Amino acid sequence: PNAIALTEYQAKIFFGNEDPIGKTFSAKYTYENETITYEVAAVIKEYPQSFLKFNALAGTTSQFNGGPTLLLVNDLFNIDTFTQKLKDDKVPTFNGTGQYYFYTLQESYFQEQTYTQEYIPYIHRNQKDLLYVGLFSAILILVIACFNYANLSFSRILQQVRMIYTQKVMGASAGQIHRQLFLDTFLTVLIAFFLSLLLTLDFLPAFNQIVSGRISLGFFFSGQVLPVIVALILALSIIPSLYMSHKINSLSHSEYKSFTTGTRKRTIISGLSILQFAISIALVFATLTVRQQLTLTQTNGERYRDLIEIADWSGNHIQTFSEEIRRYPSIEEMCLSRSGIIQFNLRTMVLKDENGNELNYTLGQYEGDSTFLKVMKINILQGLSEREALKQYSTPVYINEQYARLLVPKGENPVGKPVRLYDTEFGKMEKEGEPIAIIAGIVENLYTGTLRQEVYPSLTYLTHTPPYNLVQVRLKKEHRAEALTLLQQTWEKINPNVPFEYQDIYEEFMLSNRKTIELAHLLIMYSIISLLLTAFGLFGMALYAIQQRTKEIGIRKVNGATAGEILYLLNRRFIGWVGIAFAIAVPITWYSLSCWLENFVYRVDISIGTCLLSGGIVLMVTLLTVSRHSYKAASRNPVNALQSE
């Protein structure tokens, strides 16, 4: 029963390069107040793509209180039949009213991180919508790259056609021309693939961090991915070369020029460019809006910046510990409490709407000393100060805005009235002879979780008598490392049998909003890539377009055209493309963002300013890219231009 298997990583931490088999170590379980000595029986190989996340595997102890169970089933397994069988056999459940939930590993992987009985804490999970957004954005980036390639191919096709026609005159067969076109395209794609591998090697750690992934470079050469990459390389090589070979071989000499410089080519290039600009505008627009939602999240979490929470559930040492650390200059302020900030006390509250239908709410309850509100930076909107409340009432309670909105009749002042006047369930819990809880004031809402959920109605009790279980400490930013070292040293001196642990409240709050953070970072990454690809494509297109119009520019300058007029002539087509792309991208992106923002109870509004800024950014990148070539052409001596023609 005391045998344990360690992962390679954990075994190296415990025993270094020594053979860990047969060695022992002790683990102290704080909550059970129990110490168990384990003997290492095996070392497990690391599997980065495993759905399980663990450092050790051990048998259950006598104090095991249940939890998720993994079932290995065959192909004939039917979940509905199995569920009904459990009901028919009356398999015991919690209090006789519980229920068994069944999920496949795929469903568990994409399950929301909510701490319910059916939530499995020890498996890796990811966000389905984040993966879809990432996949869709990657496809859009690939489309931009393909459009770039198509546009640049069209831009240099005249030179290719002249060369191929010369080869045909010299006796080259259709097969030889096709092989040459394929080889040219294939080498371009292959070189691009190897360059992409180098970029992937550099950016993969950042990508894994953004999406909480565990992808290694070897994954791209696995049986899952390598066939897809090979198929993509071949498709990008064969399809363009086949099209060009067929088209060129079917054209007569008189049709070459109209094919390469005619209206049809201009229409294709214009269409591809407009779609490319539309994708870039959409990604930038989405990025700016998601970034605003992330800023709203960060603003609500600022009150937790440099705030840590230290717990002692035995309650024997927290008072002594707090008195000792209070004198440290690296600590800004601190308070004692009986409940955590992120993981606080909860109870169910049932209310009725106008039609008599029952509405279930979760009520949060905090208990802290007289400095609790100050340390948490919670403003009192109405009522008494903490000091006055503790003087006037034995059990002062502050309700938050959400509580007042749900339970206090509109226009009524609840300050000075018993809590049980508004919350009947609360009244049932109050014991006879104990002081009555009186509402001392209304405080602003405290956001402790994701902005996708409505803030909990809450009660905050103030007390100046022990016992306390936690201390919340706000550190001075410039002395954070020093403060943490002092806190650990003090803890180990006062409570040597319990490891020093703390919870960073800001990190925990941002972790609960991880979906928004990862989406924002992912979109920022894709937006930058799309703008870079667009700029690269424009650079080549502008260079070719100006080369084609060298004679025209020279004649216009001889006839008195100014540099500004030449710049406008060369740039107006690109400006028009951006304008059309803006008109296409904005309605679609606006609608998509509106649907996404509906997932948030507290959200930003999509603004016209953000919309215009996204178009302005793409237009600026376009003009900066194109204008370099345009300015050189506009400022060139027309005599030299005409001589070269």
Language-model-derived ranges and their functions:
Residues 89-138, 159, 173-174, 203-231, ...:
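Membrane-helix entry/capping segments
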Residues 126-162, 189-190, 194-195, 267-291, ...:
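Hydrophobic alpha-helical transmembrane segments of multi-pass inner-membrane transport and secretion
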Residues 187-204, 208, 529, 576-593:
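Hydrophobic alpha-helical transmembrane segments that constitute the membrane-spanning cores
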